């Protein structure tokens, strides 16, 4: 495979992610929630009563901390998230989904699931397993590269 074709593969991956996110956001627009906000809410809902730190969301999704702070602020303003200080460390806050968010959960899951089903339509279970395996391999290859660039950034 040529370098040009490798670049196309990455562009196509990016395009798939962007378009999928836009499709989900359009479905959720009547609820005034974006795809990213929906994924954050579902993450909080799935973590239930123990709460979640902003850094946990950062690790799970890879969004920058400032971006996440803005998203969490908007979701708090809409009444979907509440924050409590951590016991023993007032600087850290645990985030919880509210009952209002819990009521949205079925529709969030339905909207995201509908887009995913359309995206994977026509794939056999074996093809999906292969795709998953290859994506995991890409992520494993990316991990050391990310650590290298983070070290370089911290030096400057």
State the predicted function of each range.
Residues 22-64:
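N-terminal helix-turn-helix DNA-binding core of bacterial DNA-binding proteins
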Residues 16, 20, 61, 104-120, ...:
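Alpha-helical linker/hinge and terminal dimerization helices associated
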Residues 1-5, 125-156:
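C-terminal regulatory/oligomerization modules of transcriptional regulators
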Residues 1-31, 78:
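N-terminal leader segment of winged-helix/HTH proteins
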Residues 6-10, 34, 54, 65, ...:
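Short, structured helix-loop boundary elements
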Residues 73-133:
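Charged, amphipathic alpha-helical coiled-coil/dimerization segments
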Residues 13, 41-44, 135:
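Hydrophobic structural patches
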